[in-house]
């Protein structure tokens, strides 16, 4: 039995909060105003859209229960203002308990940790097992049968990238593939791109020079979540793509140089995109290379040597030399042949990858090369990933 399955055995009220005790012996307090704010009756909550109707600022300061009742599966309260009645499911109280928490935040969505467990990798790990899906199978997915999209999303999430085989060598079909997954994100590069190395946009991606491992969009406040490439044509040599599992590399840095890892979670790194005459994009707030969530877990790596701006806003000038030492240690790890997977893209095969996790690069090339692709927002992708792989109800239970 998990904590989510426990039943209510006792409730009490001490004036400012309601206490709930479960059959496992655990208990938690819930403030009066918090409980009133989270009433899910039809007057306070629009169930069809999962949105609050109650104006939280209208709740009186002296809000208090005049009656508290419970069953094994439900808490019932009658409030002193307008004798409003509220009910709270036992499972909901366990999931959202906060004083103290009954379950870790990372376990609020039932099954998430197990189903969406990531697999960090090295080059050796990927030998003979590159994740892939088939174009026709994915495109045949329907609202009634989304298993192919479910599988595709999970492979992208688990490994940080996925190939799509047997794609028509046609930009229009590639665009349809992107839209089958999620909405395409428009930027100053356009929505769906179709480009050659003609510098039609003043960015190194539109040249034939070597581009080292990086993530895209460090100059945006909201960096793209996914990126898809399709090499439509190449009449020449070179242009090999590489992928690096930056999350795996971050674990190495944290183990070998913990002080450098910690530094790179704090030092903000400014970035810009200013190649176009009418464009100079910079994030509202510069972000560190490693972004951690509230539990200290790594959720994003931002790394782009080309787009880094002049770093002149040091809170502690003594950290300047430490920063450069840290990124040198970091660069050594991500450039290790054991961690950098090189792959020759080819017409008819797309590559999609997690731009928050995987670095990509491209070696210098000769001849004419035509590429198409698109960005997809992370929030949109994660929403579809969760709903298809975990299920709508467990996700809704946690909001």
Swiss-Prot record:
Fe cation binds at residues 214, 216, 360. It is found in: Cytoplasm. SUPFAM superfamilies: Clavaminate synthase-like (SSF51197). Pathway: Amine and polyamine biosynthesis; carnitine biosynthesis. The keyword Magnesium does not apply. One of its GO terms (cellular component) is mitochondrion. Its EC number is 1.14.11.8. It catalyses: N(6),N(6),N(6)-trimethyl-L-lysine + 2-oxoglutarate + O2 = (3S)-3-hydroxy-N(6),N(6),N(6)-trimethyl-L-lysine + succinate + CO2. Pfam families: GBBH-like_N, TauD. Converts trimethyllysine (TML) into hydroxytrimethyllysine (HTML). Belongs to the gamma-BBH/TMLD family. This is Trimethyllysine dioxygenase.
